[in-house]
A protein has these predicted regions:
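N-terminal FAD-binding dinucleotide-binding subdomain shared by FAD-dependent oxidases/monooxygenases
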Residues: 1-294
Length: 294
């Protein structure tokens, strides 16, 4: 496999997600039950995100998605012995609009005597105690506590920097109503500011390494072109940015992604404007779109 590594990387750049997954062009709703279940079973056993490539309509058609969600629910309930715990672990609506967990021994973990799943969606963690954690009026003993508080995806790191554009406008003020960009690479009013896999690009919905490389190469080519033409500044227009944001919103609206309260929408950050930030669809086509605008 390593001997063919360069060709693998080249092929990855021509795929939907930048990963050498086997994407099925057939629709789940047009596939006989037995064949559809066999496809899900094969991908479940394989593990990983390729499960969502089982059929072409899983993330655009609720009926198709329900066939996948029901399959996963049955798998989880067959593994997790406690019914209440299994219910907490199963997707309650659309599957795949949040990061997918395809089993690699994860669900079996909840059958261990020293593992408990505590639902705090309706309550909260009340206190850290000398012995562990108190939640929902009960104390849970722990030797160590790992803080998994989530992250401010796609915009958080940029907005922690005091980036200023024309007239001293701060990027955090420009994006007060949600991030807007052109191609996920630049922001109107901020000349010579380049983002890599920023909001408005396929970004986290693809293989990030492939997408990062594509953006870095585009920025490199842009800088070379500026130098060759004797130019010192490049900036997206407001109209181009508006058109691109409209396109991203149109594509996202054709999918099931915006139906979940996920970090793709910024739903995990209190007070953050709900905007679907990545561009769903074909990362290869997005790369081609960038090249067409050079």
């Amino acid at each position: 496999w390593k001997a063919e590594y360069p060709s693998h990387r080249a092929r990855a750049k021509t795929t939907v997600s930048g990963v050498l997954f086997d994407f099925n062009d057939v629709k789940a709703v047009e596939t006989p039950d037995e064949k559809r279940i066999a496809e899900y079973e094969m991908r479940w056993q394989r593990g990983g995100l390729s499960f969502l490539g089982a059929f072409s309509d899983l993330l655009v058609d609720p009926q198709a998605n329900a066939t996948a969600a029901n399959f996963v629910r049955a798998k989880i309930r067959a593994v997790v012995e406690d019914a209440d715990t299994a219910d907490l672990l199963t997707p309650n609506n659309i599957i795949g609009c949040k990061r997918l967990c395809i089993d690699t021994g994860y669900f079996e973990t909840f059958n261990r005597s020293n593992v408990s799943l505590i639902d705090i969606s309706e309550g909260r963690i009340e206190a850290i105690t000398p012995k562990g954690v108190r939640a929902n009026g009960q104390e849970f003993e722990a030797d160590a506590i790992v803080y998994a508080t989530g992250f401010d995806a796609m915009t958080g790191a940029l907005l922690k920097i005091d980036i200023r554009g024309r007239g001293g406008l701060a990027l955090r003020d420009k994006w007060d109503g949600g991030p807007r960009s052109y191609l996920g690479l630049s922001v109107a009013g901020f000349p010579n500011l380049f983002m890599i896999t920023g909001p408005g690009s396929p970004s986290v919905l693809t293989n990030m390494i492939t997408s990062i490389e594509q953006h870095v190469e585009w920025i490199r080519d842009c800088l070379v072109a500026l130098r060759e033409r004797g130019l010192r500044r490049i900036e997206a227009t407001e109209q181009a940015q508006d058109d691109w944001v409209d396109y991203v919103n149109l594509v996202a609206g054709l999918t099931l992604f915006p139906t979940c309260n996920s970090w793709y929408l910024g739903a995990n950050v209190p007070g953050k404007t709900r905007v679907f930030m990545p561009l769903p669809g074909d990362g290869h086509l997005s790369a081609a779109d960038c090249r067409s605008r050079e």
